[in-house]
Amino acid sequence: MQIHPTAIVDSKAELADDVVIKAYSIIGPNVKIGPGTSVGPHAVIDGWTTIGARNQVCSFVAIGHPPQDFSYRDEETRVLIGDDNVFREHVSIHRGTRRGRGTTRVGSRNYIMSAAHIAHDCQIGDNVVMANVAVLGGHVEIGDFAALGGAVAVHQFVRIGTYSFIGGGSGISMDVPPYMLVVGSRPAKLYGLNTTGLKRHDFSANVLSALKKSYRILFRSGLNVRDAVDKIRVEVETCAEVELLLEFVGSSKRGVIR
């Protein structure tokens, strides 16, 4: 291990042999950090926090602090982080609450940019991008490959679907369907498929066509959700992506952005 002399690492913390802890960082007693992870200057990792392999934790990052929730009574709740993530300067990630999931989870290969905030009980998938100052309320769920622009604010309990894109400065208070492009605030609006993102991830022409047809029926036909789903099942060639979209919309508790 490479631990700077000014860093404070509790003797009970569990660190892999090649972990790097830079100047003035603080590592608490219930922290576990996997191989190849680097913790930058002035970072604080506390609480019951487990961080996987090859993560980059930059300066002034704060992970594992108590949730900003009035119900919290110092229970043993957790942060679980996967592998190959980047947490840029001043990112904050709070641990879960007992009345929530008990654990805030961040998957693998995510890029969380400067001053972003992940609140208690959030569930972040893999390959997610959160640009500078994007902030999540408690209990937010983000699917794989979703992207949030700068200064996006997401209301608690919102779900953000896989491969969706949210434009900078947007305020999100309803669910964002997978594969879609959403921009704006009060209200945010749906602007069609995230076509550029889907093409970058090599979605086939057939899948793109099926998603476009499904989008038009779900959100631009004037039909209610049940009738739109029935129409899609008759008129659109089925595929896993369309099934995921229909399941997401059908299971929404907050309603979806249109």
Curated annotation (Swiss-Prot):
UniProt keyword annotations, A-Z: Acyltransferase, Cytoplasm, Lipid A biosynthesis, Lipid biosynthesis, Lipid metabolism, Repeat, Transferase
Compartments where found: Cytoplasm
GO cellular component, one term: cytoplasm
CDD domains: LbH_UDP-GlcNAc_AT
Stored InterPro entries: Acetyltransf_C, Acetyltransf_C_sf, Hexapep, Hexapep_transf_CS, Lipid_A_LpxA, Trimer_LpxA-like_sf
Class of the enzyme per the UniProt entry, highest EC level: transferase
Catalytic activity: a (3R)-hydroxyacyl-[ACP] + UDP-N-acetyl-alpha-D-glucosamine = a UDP-3-O-[(3R)-3-hydroxyacyl]-N-acetyl-alpha-D-glucosamine + holo-[ACP]
GO molecular function, one term: acyl-[acyl-carrier-protein]-UDP-N-acetylglucosamine O-acyltransferase activity
Entry EC number(s): 2.3.1.129
Gene Ontology biological process terms, A to Z: lipid A biosynthetic process
Pathway: Glycolipid biosynthesis; lipid IV(A) biosynthesis; lipid IV(A) from (3R)-3-hydroxytetradecanoyl-[acyl-carrier-protein] and UDP-N-acetyl-alpha-D-glucosamine: step 1/6
PANTHER family: ACYL-[ACYL-CARRIER-PROTEIN]--UDP-N-ACETYLGLUCOSAMINE O-ACYLTRANSFERASE (PTHR43480), ACYL-[ACYL-CARRIER-PROTEIN]--UDP-N-ACETYLGLUCOSAMINE O-ACYLTRANSFERASE, MITOCHONDRIAL-RELATED (PTHR43480:SF1)
SUBUNIT field: Homotrimer.
Function: Involved in the biosynthesis of lipid A, a phosphorylated glycolipid that anchors the lipopolysaccharide to the outer membrane of the cell.
Similarity field: Belongs to the transferase hexapeptide repeat family. LpxA subfamily.
Name under which the protein is recorded: Acyl-[acyl-carrier-protein]--UDP-N-acetylglucosamine O-acyltransferase
Protein source organism: Syntrophobacter fumaroxidans (strain DSM 10017 / MPOB)
Lineage: Bacteria, Pseudomonadati, Thermodesulfobacteriota, Syntrophobacteria, Syntrophobacterales
